[in-house]
């Protein structure tokens, strides 16, 4: 019970960190608390003993006890390891950027070792209630059967700073924004304001990051389409181009996520080793820096196939904090099974 209380506290602290109102200092304090709690968790797992035998480090296995009045009336018992390197196993998978709009029919395979679960079809397009946001919602509706949860990332970041340009007939998702004179780095905010003025119609919100690059985000997960002359200079997208985003999956155990289908989006291929990222992780792995391959699988925001550098430890980032919440929940499930 004490270990379960520790895991509950870790999850609470991860939840506190999973919002951008936190500062670097406050997240550092939360991460330090989590590391201390994990040390306490491991201390219990490594030192709890009975009659000289360790009970919670994984060595108490296949032990036999006499329970009846006659010989050989016995019962065998094993207690799994409860240290942080053995609990919290969680599977993270992130697709590569999807490139085609289509109807997506998806089936998760062998979710319980035997049965398949079909997900309701979703249309990936620029319409309201469509896109990979709708697909993620459909996946989450059957998560009680599959054990798989989905999130999406439809954020497009320009590869270079906004240039000075005069754009014509600019439109997003079929909504006309018009002609616009744009300053370098959108210094006067004209471009961002023009896009955000119609964000309730397009579903797309704009901002400029610290490098002067345009950031376009679909809040409800619908796809984005762009049109206009010279828009590549200011938003980094060509005339009559589109952007769909990527899908992220998590399972609260270490098993691979198998699927088939995906229609023209080729979603099942997008999660393969050819562009997708997959990795299983235990609780102890979040104490230090998050390896760049693991960060990619966790769905850290990126425009390229892979993240190029390691990420800050544990709850030091928003995405890391959300991953720690999943890992802590998985660890709680493991301990519930052991009890």
Where are these regions (language model features)?
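Amphipathic alpha-helical coiled-coil/heptad-repeat segments
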Residues: 1-339
